[in-house]
Amino acid sequence: MTDVEKQTEIREKKGRNVMRELKIQKLCLNICVGESGDRLTRAAKVLEQLTGQTPVFSKARYTVRTFGIRRNEKIAVHCTVRGPKAEEILEKGLKVKEYELFKENFSDTGNFGFGVQEHIDLGIKYDPGIGIYGMDFYVVLNRNGVRVSKRRRAPGRIGPSHRVDKEETIKWFQQKYDGIILPPKPKVKKNFFRRR
C-alpha cells in the first residue's frame, strides 16, 4: 500500500465517524429595509409568518447622510432559527434558488449564505397590506464537540482537523441537497481611462 492509498483510507474512516458529521447549528434570516417605520414593521411581520418567532430589530452603527440613515436608527430585522425548523426553512429557500449556489456563497469558515428576491416564493401567501420583501439566508455549520470552545468553565480549543472548511461545506451541500455549484460570475472590467 502506498502513502496516498493509506491517506485516502484514513480519510474514508474519518468520514464515517459520527463526531465528524456536519450539522446545521443555526439559520439566520435578515431583511434590511434601510429605514425605520412602517416598512420595517411589515418586514418583521413577514419574518414572524415564516418562522413563528418574534424577530429582533437591528440598529444602524453610524450616520450615513446620503442614505438618510441616523446612528442607532432601526433599519433591519433579523431572526435566528435552530433545529428541524431551520432545516425546513432552508429547504424552502434552496428550492427557490433551484439548489444552485456559487462558490463565492461559501465562506472559508464553512458557512454559506444566499438571497431570495421575493418572500412569496417561500410559500407565504401574498398580502397587499404587507407587500413583497427579499431576504438573506445565512447558514452556520458545525460538528459535534464545538461546545468545548464555547462553554464557560474550562474552555478549550478546536483542532484544525475538526474545524469546518469551505471544501467540506460544499461537499455536504452537494450530498445532502443534490446541490449544484455554478461556475464563478464573470468579472466586468471597468475602463476608467477612456480616450476621447
UniProtKB/Swiss-Prot annotation:
Q: How does it assemble?
A: Component of the large ribosomal subunit.
Q: What is this protein called?
A: Large ribosomal subunit protein uL5A
Entry superkingdom: Eukaryota
Q: Name one GO cellular component term.
A: nucleus
Q: State the remark under miscellaneous.
A: There's a functional difference between the two L11-encoding proteins in C.elegans. rpl-11.1 plays a role in the germline whereas rpl-11.2 has a somatic function.
Q: Which GO terms describe its biological process?
A: translation
Subcellular compartments: Nucleus; Cytoplasm
Predominant subcellular localization, coarse grouping: nucleus
The consequence of inactivating this gene is: Mutants have an extended lifespan, increased volume and are sterile with a germ cell proliferation defect.
One Pfam match = Ribosomal_L5_C
Asked if DNA repair is a keyword of the record, the answer is no
In which organism is this protein found? Caenorhabditis elegans
The membrane-spanning stretches of this chain are none
Keyword Ribonucleoprotein on entry: yes
Any one GO molecular function term? RNA binding
Under PROSITE patterns, the record lists: RIBOSOMAL_L5 (PS00358)
| Function recorded in the entry | Component of the ribosome, a large ribonucleoprotein complex responsible for the synthesis of proteins in the cell. The small ribosomal subunit (SSU) binds messenger RNAs (mRNAs) and translates the encoded message by selecting cognate aminoacyl-transfer RNA (tRNA) molecules. The large subunit (LSU) contains the ribosomal catalytic site termed the peptidyl transferase center (PTC), which catalyzes the formation of peptide bonds, thereby polymerizing the amino acids delivered by tRNAs into a polypeptide chain.
Instruction: Report keywords, A-Z.
Output: Cytoplasm, Nucleus, Ribonucleoprotein, Ribosomal protein, RNA-binding, rRNA-binding
User: According to its UniProt record, which protein family does this protein belong to?
Assistant: Belongs to the universal ribosomal protein uL5 family.
Q: NCBIfam families of this UniProt entry?
A: PRK04219.1
